[in-house]
Amino acid sequence: RIAPYLTEPHAIAYWSALHHYGYTEQIPTTTFVATTAQRGSTVLEIEELGLTYRFVVLAARKFFGLRSIWIEGEEITITDQAKTVVDCFDRPEYCGGIVEAAKGLHEALTEGHVSPPQLTEYVTRMGNRTIFKRMGYLVELMALPVGQELQRWRQDLSAGYGLLDPLASDDGPYDSRWQLRLNRSPADLKDWMVH
């Protein structure tokens, strides 16, 4: 509820939005706030209240997909479900990693909260085609229903190989279908599905 007073424009995003939508059982100790405003510091701690805010400065073209919600009588801006998922594949370091991004994708699609065409539209607007690589690989791994969008994603891959998990070491096999370095094992990525 403090975020609107700290920076404008703003939106609760990444791990905080994943938690709000119930796409992760993890409870982030930091509130992640997306903004286009340059700040002197990316982290703000309010010690008296025990709060930590992490500001993620985005290019204006990446600041979209927002909605308003009400929490305890306060209007809050938050990324919508599709933008939350896409943001997490763009910057996994702000959502707890690629496994948390995969959980978000799985929940959003299986619960019908996002449509595959909306994901395609948002990734295209973001301008980071590595998102298609990461999402495509995980959609196939988790056998998620995205229909013909999967083929659209494959047609729009960026050149070269990207890392599946930018937070993990740069090793592991190469996947030529999705042009990814698989630096996380399928078992690691799906372990949460069996618990």
Regions found by a protein language model. Give the residues of each.
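Short gly/ser-rich loop at a beta-strand->alpha-helix junction or flexible surface loop bordering the NTP-binding
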Residues: 1-60, 180
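Hydrophobic alpha-helical interaction segments
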Residues: 66-195
